[in-house]
């Protein structure tokens, strides 16, 4: 069975909510929309205090080509434009809306009828995706229309759909495949048409046999779409690892990107969002969020409007357990601990993980023993012990030369470290510093 060739680990899966059908969460009383929910330029608000909005009203315009518009997920009145600390831990400008009713924009098709036919050109499909504010739903939140617009000299050969969901605990993509397989496949066809390719792949790890079976059955009418079962190994959902596993091609080091080996990679949730944007005129304003944890009373998958506070999802899943040690935005490998559970759900909010005291406890960090376990598991072939040490000492020139910008921040190194070193924290610090140095250097050219 296929998998990527370098490194990888096998953390406990803990898919506690995989058997729980998607539930629609109640509307929030107030909704908060950070103006930066994607990779790229922040958006610019186009509403002001006192303005009345509906569900699907554009409230912030894209700030450039690599950016994505933001739409209201609620109807009501704009209370203020202020700032909020989001799940990343940074304070960002945001639009605050007081919710009144649930009135939708009339242009949105709210029917459940499956719409397969699309007579739009590739350029028109890409424009609709852009105008709907669709971004990568796997967490990176890269604007989807940008991936469908290859740089000069590059040509796409295939679309690869990431349905791996290798992050422990999270089950949103799994449930989406079980409940919306036909819509996903139409979305894949739309992405293929927009990318001007004739071959599509959907990579699914073999710990989801029900999803593999159902998607294979539904895809039988699309001979140009292949369902690819994959061996379970983390971080198979990484873009470069998925390309390696599915089509046996390796993406070179940055600044090379997947299109340089002919691949356009999109998350399975993105394929569904594309279907809704193109076929239903529905902008991206809601997503599926997993709320889970070993002590959580009712691990669940919620269809959640953007801007909803995470505390509302936690309450819907039974509330914070008494033995809560940490709340993570995302999963245990790549997610970040939250200091405040009132942070809003954004486009990249895939899950809320509540760890108990025992899980949350970190072992005492000790000196590196040079065991090289982190080197053996790194899926990018890096030396994480060295990157972490040099970052801790501020040796930015050294870490840049050691290819720190190739790190995908999967956390495999920290997971396997017997000395409990906070390697991912140091490497993220180093990447931030080196990224700033590179941008400043390029600005002078």
How would you label these PLM feature ranges?
Residues 105-106, 136, 159-173, 295:
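Gly-rich Lys/Arg/Thr-decorated short loops/hinges at beta-loop-alpha junctions or inter-strand turns
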Residues 85-142, 153, 209:
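Acidic low-complexity segments
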Residues 76-78:
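Conserved hydrophobic positions within beta-strands
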Residues 1-46:
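N-terminal, Lys/Arg-enriched amphipathic/low-complexity engagement segments
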Residues 349-365, 375, 379-445:
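Ferredoxin-type iron-sulfur electron-transfer modules in oxidoreductases and energy-metabolism complexes
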Residues 164, 198-310, 316-321, 331:
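Hydrophobic alpha-helical positions that pack around
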Residues 178-194:
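Histidine-anchored nucleotide/phosphate-binding helix
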Residues 48-61, 80:
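Short, well-structured beta-strand-loop connectors
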